[in-house]
Amino acid sequence: MSVTRISRESLNDILAGNAREAATCVLKFYSNSCHMCQSLHEYYIHISDNEKYKDLHFFAFNVDDDPEIEASLNFKGVPTIFVVHSHIGNRPATLRLLPDPEDPNEVTWYKVRDIKAFIDKEAL
């Protein structure tokens, strides 16, 4: 599966339970000015293409499009990754935040193995 850039309106629909179907999503928040976000980009795409994750939806949201998103979802800084379990029927989504790494990668912040382990634990 590929990564889809998501709008604030679509993100709001997922979070509020206004999605067309219940789904599990992996959501990366990034900024165009963040060098670590740019370095993580290809790895995130590669993870999304893994057959193991074929039933998951991978999204990316540019925080430059809505600077208030960090406060509304209670995270600080990018890149940031969530697993989101969306529901239907106006039932709010369940969000799980990938914790900041104890030993961050100096180029990408997160390590690929940590992202995969997080997805395996929270989404599969």
Question: Can you say where each PLM-predicted feature lies in the sequence?
Answer:
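Thiol-based oxidoreductase modules, predominantly thioredoxin-like and allied folds used
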Residues: 4-8, 29-31, 41, 45-68, ...
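A short beta-strand-turn-helix
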Residues: 4-24
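Beta-strand elements of modular eukaryotic interaction domains
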Residues: 15-18, 48-49, 68-73
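Short, solvent-exposed loop/turn segments that connect beta-strands within catalytic domains
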Residues: 19-23, 54, 87-94
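Short cysteine clusters
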Residues: 34-37
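Structural micro-motif
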Residues: 67, 73-85
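Non-catalytic, surface beta->alpha helical segment in thiol-disulfide oxidoreductase systems
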Residues: 83-124
